[in-house]
């Protein structure tokens, strides 16, 4: 294989089909919002029929503190595309203002991202230094706001406020540009046993078109969920999940609307735990 362009270019944030299950990954204001201890992990394999396709592993945990007025948590994400790997570690903090029916939350996060690449099996003309193995760690910080009621939530966030550039082969290369997220969801009670929850996620970054996710989920007996979603009307998916006591398990299958669908399918699995470990925590609902 012969290449003649840079191996490391501006990176996108990882995609999350189950963003509504782990919203703190995109908005720190969700830390502690359900007045419980929460821990979740997920694995995503994108374009599973393609060698070197994107894979993402993430963990996030957060807890409500000080009579549920504060939330604190942590995030760990590893995102890999071919030989390019980004690893993020960070902490989150949120302050909650609780009204009678609405909670306002203001969140911040800070941490480090390690950008690395190890180009192997690539024939490079003239030993281009841009293709040498690379590793650099950058600090970043982000903010988010959230308004949440009994049936709805609306959030706006910039998880990483700082753009990042590195010097490679005597050239300055931008490796990250800010992403802006707008999230909304509403819960409809169709009957005592059936709930309908549509959610939307808008993602905007400089140099890329607006990305829009729309999900429509049905939940039965507050335990079993099935849903459909689309991203930009060119990717479609199916979601199923179930709650077993304080544990929730979920699975997503995605297909592109055009092209070689069998080669570009995507799988995403998740597991979450919700506990009431403090006397001030919500003892009547898991928050799922």
Give the ranges of each region predicted by the language model.
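N-terminal signal peptide c-region/cleavage motif recognized by signal peptidases
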Residues: 4-5
